[in-house]
């Protein structure tokens, strides 16, 4: 009798653990990496190491993490039936039945509540940004994702909202050139996601996303190429016309560059890094490996190296030491 009771207790523990793991998987925490976009304004305004501003953006980051997870769970609830026929998505907690729909809905509503609670205490504009993001994502799940072109625009809009939400928290102004960069990169990632999905599901009968059936590879190829070019070109224009003020340490010989370019345009040295990153990502797209951009950004060594190098150079230029503005 005692053995039976012990086995029952262990079974309950296993079930509870499996349920918890399913709930965490449904929230897709790996996708939170996309919310690092909220730190963009903080980085380029030169206030990255201001503790008050950093704390505000970090709380905003947490709020968007909750909001992002909630929208993914809601989308999984709506797509549960079709996902069961997808070669990859059928393993998701809701589609596989590991997380019952009722509990998934409770989890999603709880995460929405946490996101709005954090947003309310930060900034009215940020609060509206979270609400807008949630509304757009719900509409996307309800059917907008089935409309070609519009689905790509909505995915891209999510990235744009993140960047500007981060700016709202610290009352920062982002230039028009930077907005162009954000839009271009967002469209590049979104079109790349669709192109990779089409590459994965080669059999038309297995395509579960309605909009994907109406896309041609040639069209998505042109989108990827167009937005990839727009991304590095808009970044180049940003570094030339709107580059933040440089701050450099003992390497003052670099100030001599100002004779021909001005020190405030030192961010232009990151252009080759950006071009390499885009070329590498395009290669991954056509290999069908960019259906989930966040995983690629964490696992592809070449891409990770280019992102780390790009960020390091920017931090070095903007935060490296004494100001050389005016040289």
Predicted regions and their residues:
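Cytoplasmic-side transmembrane-helix entry/capping segments in multi-pass membrane proteins
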Residues: 148-158, 300-303
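C-terminal membrane-associated helical module and adjoining short loops/tails
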Residues: 2-24, 142, 160-327
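Multi-pass membrane catalytic core of lipid/isoprenoid biosynthesis enzymes
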Residues: 80, 85-130, 176-188, 222-228, ...
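Acidic (Asp/Glu-rich) catalytic motifs at the cytosolic membrane interface
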Residues: 64-95, 144, 150, 191-199, ...
